[in-house]
């Protein structure tokens, strides 16, 4: 009985220690992924959202529902998230700044992110990066979109939509994570969020999602 009790106690201790290290590893992975996601949006993602907003015929309708406060709060973010989730993008490739888009998609950071194990394991992030590489190839193949036939423009519109929707979904997911664990960084990024109208501007423009 003593041996049995000791064995049971040892098993419980070992299991507890294993759980501790597993949770610690999960926390570390989440923190590392968060750092990479912050870097992505800082260097590429936010600007990409702004560029793709310019291609969205439905953006004017969306912008009328977005908050436009002088100082953004978490409540404004929740209103923004709600508006984005119910929005449907309507992409016009001919409205895109293709040169700026090509330059952004040529960033070496995309390759480094795709090689990062934590990004590879994140289905949404990994899929988004691969879709961005696909669009990069399409734009390289078609330097002048104005000469394309409608079926090819429709194909490009679909490619851009496949980027825009998960891109904004990842942005919302990331901002929710920051709001929970890094509120100071969350509020800092919220003040400069890619859906915020330019200073002195109105809420008109282009956007869409989920």
Where are these regions (language model features)?
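Membrane-embedded hydrophobic alpha-helical segments
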Residues: 1-23
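A broad, structural surface signal
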Residues: 2, 35, 39-42, 46, ...
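Secondary-structure capping and boundary motifs in well-ordered enzyme cores
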Residues: 4-8, 33, 124, 128
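Membrane-proximal, non-transmembrane interface segments of integral membrane proteins
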Residues: 26-108
């Amino acid at each position: 009985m003593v041996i049995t009790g000791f064995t049971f106690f040892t098993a419980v201790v070992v299991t507890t220690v294993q759980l501790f290290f597993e949770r610690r590893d999960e926390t570390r992975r989440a923190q590392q992924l968060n750092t990479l996601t912050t870097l992505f949006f800082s260097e590429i993602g936010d600007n990409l959202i702004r560029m793709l907003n310019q291609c969205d015929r439905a953006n004017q309708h969306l912008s009328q529902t977005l908050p436009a406060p002088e100082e953004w709060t978490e409540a404004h973010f929740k209103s923004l998230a709600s508006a984005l989730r119910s929005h449907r993008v309507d992409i016009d490739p001919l409205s895109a700044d293709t040169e700026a888009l090509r330059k952004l998609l040529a960033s070496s950071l995309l390759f480094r992110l795709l090689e990062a194990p934590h990004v590879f394991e994140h289905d949404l992030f990994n899929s988004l990066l691969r879709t961005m590489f696909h669009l990069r190839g399409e734009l390289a193949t078609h330097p002048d979109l104005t000469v394309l036939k409608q079926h090819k423009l429709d194909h490009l519109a679909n490619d851009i939509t496949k980027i825009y929707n998960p891109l904004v979904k990842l942005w919302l997911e990331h901002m929710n994570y920051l709001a929970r664990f890094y509120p100071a960084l969350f509020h800092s990024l919220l003040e400069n969020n890619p859906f915020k109208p330019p200073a002195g501007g109105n809420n008109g423009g282009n956007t869409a999602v989920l």
